[in-house]
Amino acid sequence: ENTKENAKNLHKRKILLIFACRIKHRQMETYKYQAEINALIQQGLKMPEVVKPNDLKGFRFVFSTDMSKSYLPNYIMKPQRAIMNGQRKVDIGGYALSCFTEKDKAIKFYQLLAKNMRNIYKAIGDGISSGIVTNNDGNITIPARNGHYNLFEFPLCDLSKTFKLEEDKL
């Protein structure tokens, strides 16, 4: 009888241990691209300060002809950009989704980029989508004066389901 009781207790402890490990692992895997972010942190980069979005309106550049890649971070679309070299500054924000607080600020930023990069539409898109960024979507950097902020997505975030196309040709 005593060995049965010990076996039951051992089984309960194993289950609790597995559960505790899963909780700890989930806390470490905060963001959708946490493994990639961790790799950059190990190279000495710092995670920016982030806050809750609290249902902030978001505007994002999109590819009007290919929405599937419109909600992927820069470094996921082009992984070679995340490799540190002397040419380019690597930033953890490359694993976040770039958004703006206002449509006119997004358009102004796009026009500024277009002056220096003729084919900007190939890199970041040719349209604008908008939606509400909720606390369930992830955390954001504090919006800059130009309205830009980065959304570090939680694993279940999918803006393609909540954002709608506003402008299909910039």
PLM region spans:
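Short, Lys/Arg-enriched N-terminal segments with co-localized hydrophobic residues
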Residues: 1-27
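Charged phosphate-binding loop/patch that engages nucleotide di/tri-phosphates or the phosphate backbone
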Residues: 152-170
